[in-house]
Amino acid sequence: MMNLNMTMQNNRAYLGADGLKNYLKPKADEYIPLVELPSELNPFLESHDIHISAKLMNTLPLGNVKSLPAYYLLNSVDAISKNVVESSSGNTVFSMGLFAKSLGIKSVKAVKSNTVTRGKLQLLRLAGIDVLLVDGPICPDAHDPNSSISIARRLGNESGNCNPGQYDNFANPQAHRDVTGPQIFDQLGENLGMFVAGLGTTGTLVGTAGYLKEVLPELRVGGVVRVPNNQVPGVRTSNDLREIDFNWKDILTEDLVAIDEVDAYKSSLDMIRQGLLVGPSSGFAYAGACTMIENIINSGNGDMLRGKHVVFVCPDSCFPYVEEYFEILGESSFPEIDNQSSGPVPGFEGNNSNNKPARIDDISPEKLYEDIKKTNPKFKIIDVREPREFFDHHIKGSKQVSYYNIEDWATQLKDTELTDSYVFVCSRTGRSLRAASIAKKIGIENVFVLAGGTAAWSAKGFDRVLPNSCLPNNKPVL
């Protein structure tokens, strides 16, 4: 007869007195899903045989990548019967709070910036975590005595308290060295060509890539950073990374790629609509991975990834950020509500139902390519990427306009005769969709976006201008 007091790990039934504890405990031998993206999400699959796969850390028991280091961090300090105090943007301290009872921890307090979203704040309270809000940025400076990190350290030194310290405790990357890295290698072996992660504490990159580079010395490694003044949860700007003590720089083989909130949320939305319920930091890493692949192809080195997998990390789910998707992407990214009831749409009572959001059509790379070959092209191309990206490569005939200046550009344009059609271009489609929506709202009627952005254009091998390259301007880089 089966002993029901045993934890049945083979069939993932966690039974007996320690069943819940064993379910929550990270396990290297229970594989976190690795899912290859279909061609609808991978513009390089058919053209270059480059595969993109997502490591779905959102499928862990606590729903986020930080639950791995959180468990290791708690076990690295004497936390039993103590009050844990931790500075965290959300998922680390959330996980600590949910591990607390099974590990015999008295209580957990989060020290957080007052810029935290309401959704994240309520999630912590839902988990029974005490919250101390302090002044300061969402990504605090570990060396600032007034930052949430320093405050958590001081509180952790008080009697009965402890501070695990995710920003400088090597238990953070060790969790990924023990679990994430070996799993990815077991799942792909030598078919792994590049590993990409968003950079916050850098623990995921340092631990995972640190292990992978030992077994695959030729592995390419990329880090993704946040564009300044953009809200993407859990990740830092390149300047903010100077405050991190882990040795992340020596692991990278690629230049840092900066992604903004619009591309992060839009890329996440693309994955959600294919069935992967991942959050904005997942879209952030995905968009960064696509940009790195595009850069490698444009440098003439696409063959080094041919037949290989590029793996990026999905840190958490979309559910804590639902309101932010609508706020950042705007209503044009979502289906209209057909309200045939007698009352207002729930949650939209104050809105004017006749004031419908602008709908933006896209143009395929093939259609735009055929147009620019004409003597008098129909479309004017507006590239809203950063100047650095534009001067690295761009579509012939395009004009660079800063995304942050689109409102001024459109306001000036609407005072002239509007007979032209404008195609907005970015690396994917997130930023260009938002820019086109702004222009249309101001009064520029004939606006479109390039489907798939410059990533899709490059994947097709269409002509690009390469100011920083010695290659001929009109020769496709394959």
Model-derived features: where do they sit?
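Compact, charge-rich alpha-helical regulatory domains located at protein termini
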Residues: 415-423
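Histidine-bearing beta->alpha loop at or near hydrolase active sites
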Residues: 452-456
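A short acidic-Thr-Gly-centered motif at the start of a beta-strand
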Residues: 369-377
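Mid-chain, well-packed structural core segment of small domains
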Residues: 427-428
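Alpha-helical scaffolding within the catalytic cores
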Residues: 407-412
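PLP-dependent amino-acid enzyme catalytic core
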Residues: 1-367, 380, 386-404, 420, ...
